[in-house]
Amino acid sequence: METQGASLSLGRWSLWLLLLGLVVPLASAQALSYREAVLRAVGQLNERSSEANLYRLLELDPAPNDEVDPGTRKPVSFTVKETVCPRTTQQPPEECDFKENGLVKQCVGTVTLDPSNDQFDINCNELQSVRFRPPIRRPPIRPPFNPPFRPPVRPPFRPPFRPPFRPPIGPFPGRR
């Protein structure tokens, strides 16, 4: 009887631990990831925009390292680029291709990771039109060719040519 009561008690504890294990992930899964919060902010920017096409996340700066409450505002910095999808479409921006030579905007501000709180404060400024073309390959710049200095090669020194000395034959004037 005692073992039967112990096994019932153990079964109840197992059931409680199982239920607790199911509830805790649900509570922690409610917080958005940094990227998800930024994607929601981009969606809100697209809804509030008066421009013809949707914008899509191009680059996201790394998340701050501090672990804080999901309800607090986190600083964000990211870039968006114009897509080919019109703003009136129901298609998500992530499924749209980037527009060739589309506008690129740098955005900074704050977002919250709490999914029930869609508050964000984002300001975007146009950077430039980005053209995706391969870089021009140019040959490397080389300095002009200057060979090492070498003095001119001269023939070995030879004295001027003089015929060999031949004593004169005959009487010499001034000698006796």
From Swiss-Prot:
Gene3D superfamilies according to UniProt: 3.10.450.10
A Pfam short name: Cathelicidins
Localization per Swiss-Prot or TrEMBL: Secreted
Propeptide: 30-130, 174-176
One Gene Ontology term from the biological process aspect of the record: antimicrobial humoral immune response mediated by antimicrobial peptide
Cited function: Binds to the lipid A moiety of bacterial lipopolysaccharides (LPS), a glycolipid present in the outer membrane of all Gram-negative bacteria. Shows a potent antimicrobial activity against the Gram-negative bacteria E.coli, S.typhimurium and P.aeruginosa. Less active against the Gram-positive bacteria S.aureus, L.monocytogenes and B.subtilis.
Signal sequence extent: 1-29
Residues modified to Pyrrolidone carboxylic acid: 30
Similarity section: Belongs to the cathelicidin family.
Native organism: Capra hircus (Goat)
Gene Ontology MF terms in the entry: lipopolysaccharide binding
Disulfide links within the chain: 85-96, 107-124
Location of region: Disordered: 135-176
SUPFAM superfamilies tied to this protein: Cystatin/monellin
Protein name (record): Cathelicidin-2
Entry-linked InterPro entries: Cathelicidin-like, Cathelicidin_CS, Cystatin_sf
Keyword annotations: Amidation, Antibiotic, Antimicrobial, Disulfide bond, Pyrrolidone carboxylic acid, Repeat, Secreted, Signal
Sequence ranges of Pro residues compositional bias: 141-176
GO cellular component: extracellular space
UniProt modified residues of type Proline amide: 173
Comment field on protein domains: BAC5 sequence consists almost exclusively of X-P-P-Y repeats.
